[in-house]
């Protein structure tokens, strides 16, 4: 790949901020890089394909292939694979038969270990042992005597209650008077209108603009 493609070309516009970066028009081209990579890969593939074809068509390779086929190596490998598969099948069958035999022996052993049926003498002994004397009944607990009910208190009817009348000469004691504090007025801050920000000078007005100031649309050319 030519290194001259990485440098800007004379007479073409430059859109980058600094000379020599990849943003410049006419600088580094991704399309040329992709085409060069694809051409290199195609050349490597064609070279490998032609080399393999030449080796396959050579006389030495043909003789080696015929000798390999006549030696019977493939037949021996096939027979060995068949014997291996048959031996694995026999091993699996023997394993399954041994597991079934173990389960059968375990089931028969559990049946033999069960207790024999009870005889008449054993049944009679069990009945005699169960017919034991019951414990003597506990003494009867006397019933508790209910406590006497207290007499009901007759309530006073509301009509019979009379308020106490005080004599006119007797004064009523009153506490000191407490003056309640007057509520303070809550000062609500008035809404003041905000002052509009005024622009002072063209410099502050151009700060919010995008680009490089006044000349952000200008073009620079490579020389």
Swiss-Prot record:
Superkingdom, natural source: Viruses
Post-translational modification: Ubiquitinated by Nedd4 following partial capsid disassembly; which might play a role in intracellular virus movement during entry.
Residue ranges annotated as motif Nuclear export signal: 64-73, 204-215
Keywords: Capsid protein, Cytoplasmic inwards viral transport, Disulfide bond, Host cytoplasm, Host nucleus, Host-virus interaction, Late protein, Microtubular inwards viral transport, Phosphoprotein, Ubl conjugation, Viral capsid assembly, Viral penetration into host cytoplasm, Viral penetration via lysis of host organellar membrane, Viral release from host cell, Virion, Virus entry into host cell
Region (Binds to importin alpha/beta, involved in hexon nuclear import): 213-223
Pfam families: MCPVI (PF02993)
Induction: Expressed in the late phase of the viral replicative cycle.
Positions of the pro-segment in this chain: 1-27
Region (Interaction with hexon protein): 45-71, 206-212
Statement: the UniProt record of this protein carries the keyword Phosphoprotein: yes
Residue ranges of the region described as Involved in endosomal membrane lysis: 29-50
Region spans: Amphipathic alpha-helix essential for membrane lytic activity: 28-51
Annotated site residues (Cleavage) in this chain: 27-28, 212-213
CC terms in the record's Gene Ontology section: host cell; host cell cytoplasm; host cell nucleus; viral capsid; viral procapsid
InterPro entries: McpVI (IPR004243)
UniProt family annotation: Belongs to the adenoviridae protein VI family.
Additional remark text: All late proteins expressed from the major late promoter are produced by alternative splicing and alternative polyadenylation of the same gene giving rise to non-overlapping ORFs. A leader sequence is present in the N-terminus of all these mRNAs and is recognized by the viral shutoff protein to provide expression although conventional translation via ribosome scanning from the cap has been shut off in the host cell.
Domain characteristics, as noted in the entry: N-terminal amphipathic alpha-helix domain is essential for the membrane lytic activity. Late-budding domains (L domains) are short sequence motifs essential for viral particle release. They can occur individually or in close proximity within structural proteins. They interacts with sorting cellular proteins of the multivesicular body (MVB) pathway. Most of these proteins are class E vacuolar protein sorting factors belonging to ESCRT-I, ESCRT-II or ESCRT-III complexes. Minor capsid protein 6 contains one L domain: a PPXY motif which binds to the WW domains of HECT (homologous to E6-AP C-terminus) E3 ubiquitin ligases, like NEDD4.
UniProt name for this protein: Pre-protein VI
């Amino acid at each position: 790949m030519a290194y001259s493609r990485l440098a800007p070309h004379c007479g073409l516009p430059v859109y980058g901020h600094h000379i020599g970066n990849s943003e410049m028009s006419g600088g580094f081209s991704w399309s040329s890089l992709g085409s060069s990579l694809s051409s290199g890969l195609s050349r490597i593939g064609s070279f490998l394909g032609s080399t393999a074809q030449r080796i396959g068509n050579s006389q030495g390779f043909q003789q080696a292939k015929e000798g390999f086929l006549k030696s019977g190596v493939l037949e021996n490998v096939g027979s060995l694979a068949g014997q291996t598969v048959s031996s694995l099948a026999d091993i699996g069958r023997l394993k399954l038969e041994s597991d079934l035999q173990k389960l059968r022996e375990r089931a028969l052993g559990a049946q033999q270990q069960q207790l024999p049926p009870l005889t008449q003498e054993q049944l009679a002994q069990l009945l005699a042992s169960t017919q034991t004397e019951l414990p003597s009944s506990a003494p009867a607990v006397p019933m508790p005597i209910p406590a006497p009910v207290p007499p009901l208190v007759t309530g006073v009817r509301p009509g019979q209650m009379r308020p106490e009348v005080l004599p006119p000469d007797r004064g009523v004691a009153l506490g000191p008077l407490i003056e309640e504090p007057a509520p303070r007025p809550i000062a609500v801050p008035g809404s003041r209108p905000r002052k509009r920000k005024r622009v002072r000078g063209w410099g502050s007005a151009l700060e919010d603009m995008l680009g490089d100031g006044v000349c952000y649309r200008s073009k620079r050319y490579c020389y």
